[in-house]
Amino acid sequence: MASKPVVLIDLNVLLDVLQKREPFFKSSAELLAAVEKGRIQGFLAAHSLTTLFYLIQKGKSSAEARAIITNLLQFIHVALLDQNTIEQALNLDYEDFEDAVQMISAVQCKADCLVTRNEKDFQPALLPVMKPVDFLNTL
């Protein structure tokens, strides 16, 4: 039996689900459901969780942010973020440093793919970069 695919999920995919953003909600929710069901091994970059916490508590409350992140951690792994991650990201020729950190995090957790809606932000890509709908079509 082939091993299940490993993906690093960009924060915008989570926000599509949490904020029910159309027309992206359906495919992003299907991706998270596949991770929750164990069909895919999903990772988030560590810094995405701090940003997510901030955005949730700004609109709702700290308690709600804690509850949502606690739930996510039941089925999503956290990609390590250390000095090596930062140093490698600094050496990527990306306009946005946060995107470089995401890409290096994906490489370090041995992801098969980085799933995002902003494919153009991850060039040059060190591994495949796909939208949720496109990745789901590969399953």
Task: Name what the model sees in each region.
Residues 1-6, 30, 75, 107-139:
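Acidic, PIN/NYN-like endoribonuclease modules and their adjacent C-terminal/linker elements
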Residues 43, 79, 130:
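General small-molecule cofactor/ligand-binding pocket signal
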Residues 29-32, 49-77, 84-85:
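Active-site-proximal, substrate-binding regions of enzyme catalytic domains
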Residues 1-44, 57-64, 124, 138-139:
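Short, well-structured N-terminal submotif of metal-dependent ribonuclease cores
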Residues 2, 76-119:
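Active-site neighborhoods of divalent-metal-dependent phosphate/nucleic-acid chemistry enzymes
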Residues 14, 49, 86, 122, ...:
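A generic structural signal for short hydrophobic patches within well-formed alpha-helices
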Residues 33-36, 70-74, 90-91, 107, ...:
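Alpha-helix boundary recognition
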